[in-house]
């Protein structure tokens, strides 16, 4: 009986997983069409000459590039949030050495295509790329763009993060944490030091300290460093 029950539960799980996969597939198709204001056939045609082996190219972990072959597009999709003042630099990376052939489309050497779009989001810009240009993917990663820090993006919520929900929770977990945890602790230190003086214009010393504690303690590596420092100080 237990064996039959296990088989039935396994069957149900497999059906659920297949439904989820189909839903994600449709979501990715609709997102690509919506973002770049074209149709799926046009996107597939633009990247038809991309070798499938391109998907095995080693690429930097941040911001991350997803191969879109599962929806018939032989290209990488990249999405990240950046600060507003970084946007011109980002756009120039996309446009440099490429011919603009449409509102969202750039071409290099005839067969290297890039689709680009952007939208305002939380004191910054959300940028999207669809490209078979590996050099561009690496250049974007090397430029080290970053999302607006939480004390700007969510200034109105304050530094308390114990009860995040909705858009704020999604932003912290999928935008900020993804960027922040990609940095080393030394790089995090440098990031904060670079922004200390500008934060003085709208945050008191006490508020700044509260924001730093809230942001930094989200990272397990930083919490471990605090524990190590505490143990060392007690000796």
Predicted regions and their residues:
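Polar/charged low-complexity regulatory segments
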Residues: 2-235
